[in-house]
Swiss-Prot record:
Protein name (database record): Sulfate adenylyltransferase subunit 1
Species name: Laribacter hongkongensis (strain HLHK9)
EC number in record: 2.7.7.4
Pfam families, A to Z: GTP-eEF1A_C (PF22594), GTP_EFTU (PF00009)
PANTHER family: TRANSLATION FACTOR (PTHR23115)
Keyword Transmembrane helix: no
Chain positions recorded as GTP binding sites: 31-38, 110-114, 165-168
Gene Ontology molecular function: ATP binding; GTP binding; GTPase activity; sulfate adenylyltransferase (ATP) activity
Region feature (G2): 89-93
Length: 481
């Protein structure tokens, strides 16, 4: 089952070649405080024989000082690396770990369970394909269980494994497991998650983590590791149309001009006709360039450089799509599910930086439609947002950009709000829908709302540097008072 490292010592090149062809699964572990998330990851790594001898020796030494269990070795210390985490016996930051089996590679994000660190959990979930929701068998479904399940659903995670942990403390009682299973399924009816699996286990003792447990004969399903190894991800990509957000324009000399980025969705080949958004200009792909040479085809997840047949204006943040396929929306008014991540509350009407893929634009939240109570799934009236709160809002940006719905494509349907002074990340948004404002013709003459200091600076430039021939910003097309 688990990946053996003997090949690394014998033939590193053969190991790397085999490793590159494996499927990659990113998953998170989340749940309430002290449900055993870090212990579970430690057990996965330990029982998979993926801990080096020096790591195990270090954990044995640290266990004498920071042990939170009755065992000689506290496996949670493999993941809880911050001093504050070890002293308090909790997870604060998102900890990433890597391992593999014979068929699949894994990236684990161990997310904090405390409510004040929910923003950290949202960060870990933003790139995950699967979520392991841990539930303490003694307490059942808790508030944080609901909160994390809702965030996982909100962030588009399509697969959930509910791991009922600490079954050893309840004598591996089947009735307890079945009750928790039913409670969670009842709650999950309100969530957009269609693949939910359940497994009873003991992370501390190792039951049903890597190998099936002999102490739960009533459970005939796969172990947690077997589930992780077998879940299919090939149907998760909802969008098949080509999307390439431009991250960088590569111009090393006069003879080469390439547009670099990671393909967010779809497939591209030399000769394909493409459209650049939001400008709408068209051309054909001349070549797909990588560090390994030119490719005959490129697909989702590959970092490539496209060269085009025509010299057209393309900048960082523009999107290249394939002609004839469904197009993204080019809009400056978005309906967004927003997770607020800052101590200072959201202020409607205040200007923030909006970052989507490689694009940075000023924008503002103009309305809060409702706040979501993650415990009851009910919508509540709200005019602002506090730390860790989630709401549906209207976000207006100062120029149109090409976007997709988050459910269709994560990379082109997600954004963050950034403070324009401190550059602190304030919130994470998932685009639900988009609509263009009236009068938009192109990005350059899109409606703008100039700030007072920008207009004042423009006046100073025109007064003291008339030879620069600067135009009055208030006369620019689309200016709004």
């Amino acid at each position: 089952m688990t990946h053996q490292s003997d090949l690394i010592a014998e033939d590193i090149h053969a190991y790397l070649a085999r490793h590159e062809t494996k499927d990659l699964l990113r998953f998170i572990t989340c749940g309430s405080v002290d449900d055993g998330k870090s212990t579970l990851i430690g057990r996965l790594l330990h029982d998979s024989r993926l801990i080096f001898e020096d790591q195990l020796a270090a954990i044995e030494r640290d266990s004498q000082k920071h042990n939170t269990t009755d065992e000689a070795v506290d496996l949670a210390l493999l993941v809880d690396g911050l001093q504050a985490e070890r002293e308090q016996g909790i997870t604060i930051d998102v900890a990433y770990r890597y391992f593999s089996t014979d068929t699949r590679k894994f990236i684990i994000a161990d997310c904090p369970g405390h409510e004040q660190y929910t923003r950290n959990m949202a960060t870990g979930a933003s790139t995950a394909d699967l979520a392991i929701i841990l539930i303490d068998a003694r307490y059942g479904v808790q508030t944080q269980t609901r909160r994390h399940s809702f965030i996982a659903s909100l962030l588009g995670i399509r697969h959930v494994i509910v791991a009922v942990n600490k079954m050893d403390l309840l004598e591996f009682d089947q009735a307890v497991f079945e009750r928790i299973r039913q409670d969670y399924l009842t709650f999950a009816k309100a969530l957009d998650i269609h693949d939910i699996r359940f497994v009873p286990l003991s992370a501390l003792r190792g039951d049903n983590v890597v190998s099936p447990s002999e102490r739960m004969p009533w459970y005939d399903g796969p172990s947690l590791m077997q589930l992780l190894d077998s879940i299919r991800l090939d149907a998760d990509q909802a969008l098949q149309a080509f999307r390439l957000p431009v991250q960088y324009v590569n111009r090393p000399n006069l003879d080469f001009r390439g547009f670099c980025g990671t393909i967010a969705a779809g497939v591209i080949r030399p000769g394909d006709q493409v459209t650049v958004l939001p400008s709408g200009r068209q051309s054909r792909v001349r070549a797909i360039v990588t560090t390994d040479g030119e490719l005959p085809v490129a697909a989702t997840g590959q970092a490539v450089t496209l060269t085009l047949e025509d010299e057209i204006d393309i900048s960082r943040g523009d999107m290249i799509v394939r002609h004839g396929e469904p197009l993204p929306l080019v809009a400056d008014r978005l309906t967004v599910e927003l997770v607020w991540m800052h101590d200072a509350p959201l202020q409607t009407g205040r200007a923030y930086w909006v970052k989507l893929a490689g694009k940075w634009l000023p924008g503002r939240v103009t309305a809060v439609h409702h706040r979501v109570n993650v415990n009851t799934m009910e919508r509540e009236a709200a005019s602002s947002l506090a730390l860790n709160e989630i709401a549906e809002v209207t976000l207006e940006i100062d120029a149109p950009m090409a976007v997709d719905a988050y459910r269709q494509c994560r990379a082109t349907g997600s954004l963050i709000l950034v403070d324009r002074i401190s550059n602190a990340t304030l919130g994470a948004g998932m685009i639900r829908s988009a609509e263009p404002s009236a009068g938009i013709q192109s990005e350059k003459d899109a409606a703008r709302r100039w700030q007072a200091f920008e207009i004042e600076f423009n006046e100073l430039v025109r007064r003291h540097f008339p030879h620069w021939q600067a135009r009055d910003m208030r006369d620019w097309p689309g200016h709004k008072e």
